[in-house]
Regions:
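Terminal, basic amphipathic appendages of nucleotide-handling enzymes
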Residues: 2-146, 154-155, 163, 340
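Short, conserved charged micro-motifs
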Residues: 33-38, 598-604, 645-653
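Short, intrinsically disordered low-complexity segments
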Residues: 48, 622-650
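Conserved short beta-strand edge segments in small beta-sheet-based binding/regulatory domains
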Residues: 87, 618-622, 659-673
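Inter-lobe coupling/hinge segments of SF2-like helicase ATPases
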Residues: 127, 132, 155-237, 241-602, ...
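Short secondary-structure junctions
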Residues: 452-455, 612-620, 660-661
Length: 673
């Protein structure tokens, strides 16, 4: 029987998880030809799902073979995804060994009309930026590179200390590229939504507000869908966003900027697909044949190594010469950094978290109406709590993690948000009296108020950041001078430009170095240097002071951080990683299996290890229990796999795709513990 000319076979990827051992697309019958990228509704396993059309072909005589195809229910929107988005989705799916439908779901926002008008960013008068020679040279190098030539490297690393004018380079590069081709679009990636208000303020001063859009988890589903459509039509020229912005339907990109490129927040580690937006952005730049710039005061070890090996063009910016720019207080160029040995504080009977040196500097800053940032990388009133009767640590029943005492009187788990009542009981002896050990943001706040009861304090940590518009409010209040002291975790360590901040206190540097992870030293160095860079900004009236508190002042990373000695830090870390074949010299996949039954976990991981250890060219760790042994009631066990840089062995990839439900495959993890 001949196929009818009006019938077509449509290949559709359902927007759901399909096992990697199966084909990621399904064939359906349609009376009409449906273009690739179209969003459709399809029947699948007694359910109706949305899917994306991958391709179309003519029907063929299949009745003799007994092949019956279901029909597509309806076309929701034609060409919903662009060809570039489909190509990018396939790359992410292949590299991160993640189901294509799960990946594509990130490219499809909920189709909801915004209840209110999109937020106006505010039209501001365009300013003129006076560039230094080094800044101008950087702009020229970026903007005049022709990416259509295959021999030209269009990837750059912009490396310069905090306050060196990297943002000014981005803005001028965008302006020059846009002047030559007004149809181009630009993507500015920021690591966290906390940096959104300042990014809007800075870019909004130079570009039309109606051409700028923000994409982050802070905006509503309706606003996101509206923004998506405007990007697709070309109405929006500049997109400022967190990692989710890389999925937007850009028509023609001219430049991608990855600001604070060292930040681990660019990696999605807690759900599929476990992608790194920095690597995905590089592929997006290749697809659009556009330039891409990574910028940082403390580049990741891998990025700097790649720049030294000519994979990126290295552009270095010196610290701004304020005298050259005509800024009065040019003599305030050097930050005074002190390392305080907290062992000596204990010998002197000071048992608080605030050293005498830091207390003195806080008093001085408050006296002269200057602002202070106190950095502690842990929220709550303590690190953990123990039963006073039997010394048992109070733990989460679902995750087995130590619970953190909050000033509301309850204990909370940072992993699953489990909360106790106000009077929890010890699981072992039934005791109700607990001693809180260690530090957190709330305990530091309490101690500061004991010393300085009139000080106005803001606290920025992950517990508070869940409140709507919290980031905008905290930045607005502190930049307007409504608070004297900002106490916060990682979210305050980068990006914020606050000229009145003259003092930085790093309360517990040891906490940053305490994890047995190969990334720990890099994270610690970056955190200390980044948060120190919040002081002594251009326009400051007082010299910057940084106080680093530690029980191990002899620690090399603490010393190099205090000196802001990136070169020596880089050489130390690279030497260690080369010896162990760790990134950037090798690649890593972290395999985690989790289940409510511990015996099943043991068996699954043991069976997988047996199959994997026979593969040539890979090195495996023994199956082991990770730092977090249980999450939300599920037991966990993991295997770390190392193999040569970038290219995953074909046999390993096949075995990983065979793994069933319960397995987590994390390529290029940000932690191996």
């Amino acid at each position: 029987m001949k196929a009818k000319n009006n019938k077509h076979i449509i290949d559709v990827v359902p927007l759901t998880k399909i096992p990697l051992t199966s084909h990621q697309s399904f064939s359906y019958l349609s009376e009409t030809e449906i273009p690739a990228g179209t969003l459709v509704s399809i029947p699948l396993f007694r359910r109706n799902l949305e899917g994306i059309v991958l391709g179309v072909r003519k029907d063929f005589p299949r009745f003799n073979a007994g092949i019956e195809l279901k029909k597509i229910d309806k076309i929701i929107e034609e060409k919903f995804l662009t060809p570039d988005q489909i190509e990018l989705a396939k790359v992410i799916s292949d590299y991160y060994i993640s189901p294509l439908g799960v990946v594509m779901k990130n490219f499809v926002p909920k189709r909801v009309k915004p209840r209110i008008r999109n937020q106006e960013l505010g039209i501001k008068k365009r300013k003129n930026i006076i560039l230094t020679k080094e800044q101008n040279d950087s702009v020229e190098k970026i903007s005049k590179t022709n990416c259509k030539l295959k021999i030209v490297n269009c990837k750059f690393l912009l490396y310069g200390p905090s306050g060196s004018g990297k943002t000014e380079v981005y803005i001028n590069a965008i302006s020059q590229i846009a002047d030559r081709n007004p149809q181009l679009q630009f993507l500015i990636l920021i690591p966290e939504k906390t940096l959104t208000p300042q990014a809007i303020e800075r870019y909004g001063a130079y570009f039309k507000s109606e051409e700028i859009a923000v994409i982050s988890s802070n905006i509503s589903k309706g606003q996101l869908y509206s923004t998506w459509q405007k990007i697709k039509s070309g109405e929006i020229k500049i997109v400022i966003g967190t990692r989710m912005a890389i999925f937007a339907p850009f028509r023609n990109l001219g430049l991608i900027v990855i600001d604070e490129e060292q930040d681990m927040s660019y990696k999605q580690w807690d759900m599929n697909p476990r992608y790194d937006a920095r690597k995905v952005a590089e592929k997006l730049a290749e697809i659009h044949k556009c330039k891409i710039v990574r910028g940082s005061a403390t580049p990741s070890v891998e990025s700097y190594w790649r720049a030294l090996n000519k994979e990126y063009g290295l552009i270095e910016l010196p610290k701004l010469n304020l005298k050259e720019l005509g800024i009065r207080n040019y003599e305030l160029g050097k930050t005074n950094t002190t390392i305080v040995d907290m062992k000596r504080e204990r010998w002197d009977k000071n048992y608080t978290s605030i050293s005498k040196k830091l207390k003195s500097e806080i008093a001085y800053a408050l006296k002269y109406n200057q602002q202070i940032i106190l950095f502690i990388n842990r929220q709550g009133m303590s690190s953990f709590s123990i039963c006073e009767a039997c010394k048992t640590v109070l733990r989460c029943p679902k995750c087995d993690r130590a619970l953190i005492y909050e000033k509301g009187g309850f204990y909370q788990c940072n992993h699953c948000n489990y909360k106790t009542d106000i009077f929890p009981k010890c699981k072992k002896c039934g005791g109700i009296n607990f001693k809180n050990i260690g530090l957190g943001t709330q305990k530091v706040e309490k101690e500061i108020l004991n010393f300085f009861p009139l000080a106005k304090i803001l606290v920025a940590d992950s517990a508070n950041s869940k409140k709507k518009n919290f980031q905008e409010e905290i930045y607005s209040k502190f930049s307007k001078g409504e608070a004297d002291i900002l106490i916060g975790t990682q979210m305050i360590s980068k990006g914020w430009d606050l000229p009145r901040v003259s003092l930085i206190g790093i309360i517990d540097a040891d906490n940053l170095l305490s994890l047995p992870d190969f990334f720990a030293e890099e994270k610690a160095f970056q955190s200390i240097v980044q948060v120190s860079g919040r002081a002594n900004r251009p326009g400051a009236k007082f010299p910057g002071v940084v106080v680093i508190q530690t029980f191990q002042p002899e620690n090399k990373i603490v010393q190099l951080s205090a000196e802001n000695n990136f070169q020596n830090f880089f050489e130390k870390v690279v030497e260690e990683r080369k010896a162990l074949n760790l990134p950037p010299f090798g690649s890593i996949v972290k395999l985690v299996f989790q289940d409510y039954n511990f015996q099943r976990v043991e068996k699954e991981v043991s069976d997988a290890f047996e199959k994997l250890e026979s593969i040539l060219g890979v090195k495996l760790s023994e199956p082991h229990i990770p730092l977090v042994p249980k999450i939300r009631g599920r037991f966990r066990k993991q295997i770390i796999i190392k193999f040569p840089k970038n290219k995953i062995p074909e046999k390993l990839e096949k075995e990983l795709k065979k793994l069933g439900s319960g397995w987590i495959i994390d390529r290029d993890p940000i932690s191996i513990i």
